[in-house]
């Protein structure tokens, strides 16, 4: 059963059979990553990964994809921010080898790629384009409708990388985070002077818990620590959530 199927008749909860897809999570095999999504990624889910420049969005996404590739999943990274060689150079530093990368920004082309992959990262949502000329609001609505529906129909996990302004506000409208299933944010840990410390926050999860995890961003990527806040706000979370 696909996530996108809507039921229009009222049914008693006791008579509803939960489809297997809700229990067949895609696991990377790395517990620290899987716990962020509620013990793995739900096939067909759409996710935003938001942060200011330099916080590690690309690094996190590539690491996650590499772990999933090693677990046997087909994964792809569609970049409109860096060319294939720049991205491959970053992958070399992170020891990422199995992720398929390409410079694709066209929405329909990405949708086609989702039929052939289990997880697709789009870097970034703000860089998406169409063959037909549209204003920014129409393009945003088309991207959400096309790609999020494709995720549900194909059971491909879709991850949008999102940018924040220097003031910490989301670039564009807030339609995207309201439309997806999971909102994830990476931010500097305000309680630490160390520039390498990050907080990875899941502030919305339709299929699992919300969670905050402390992580260290080093030259070789993220090391996710054990400091976890589940189901409640961390001290500095209010400011991070205000961007969404």
What are the residue ranges of the model-derived segments?
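Flexible beta-alpha connector loops of hexameric P-loop NTPases
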Residues: 99-103, 129-141
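Short acidic loop-to-helix transition motifs that present clustered carboxylates
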Residues: 83, 104-109, 165-169
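Loop/turn-to-beta-strand initiation segments
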Residues: 74, 116-119, 153-160
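The Walker A/P-loop phosphate-binding site
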Residues: 2-97, 108-115, 242-244
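Catalytic P-loop NTPase motifs of RecA-like helicase/translocase cores
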Residues: 128-129, 167
